[in-house]
Swiss-Prot record:
Belongs to the plant LTP family. It comes from Vigna radiata var. radiata (Mung bean). This is Non-specific lipid-transfer protein 1. One of its GO terms (molecular function) is lipid binding. It comes from the Eukaryota. Monomer. Disulfide bonds join 3-50, 13-27, 28-73, 48-87.
């Protein structure tokens, strides 16, 4: 999965990531697409790097909202979505 695909899948999440509130169903669909496409360690590390880059590039993202997003969508991502995450530690 490319960073462009990760960003495309998360485009509907920007409002929630910035302001909180209700997570749109289309956002959760994107989150689940990313998770389902991350089958190998290399995939998970690549997605992590893309998420880190996106978190740093989009203005106004609330770190607490980013951390809460997987749970709000009913999925478990085995690492924290944060600009400080060490993607190389992901298996």
């Amino acid at each position: 999965m490319t960073c462009g695909q990760v960003q495309g899948n998360l485009a509907q999440c920007i409002g929630f990531l910035q302001k909180g509130g209700v997570v749109p169903p289309s956002c959760c669909t994107g989150v689940k697409n990313i998770l389902n496409s991350s089958r190998t360690t290399a995939d998970r590390r690549a997605v992590c790097s893309c998420l880190k880059a996106a978190a740093g590039a989009v203005r106004g993202i609330n770190p607490n909202n980013a951390e809460a997003l997987p749970g709000k969508c009913g999925v478990n991502i085995p690492y924290k979505i944060s600009t400080s995450t060490n993607c190389n530690s992901i298996n």
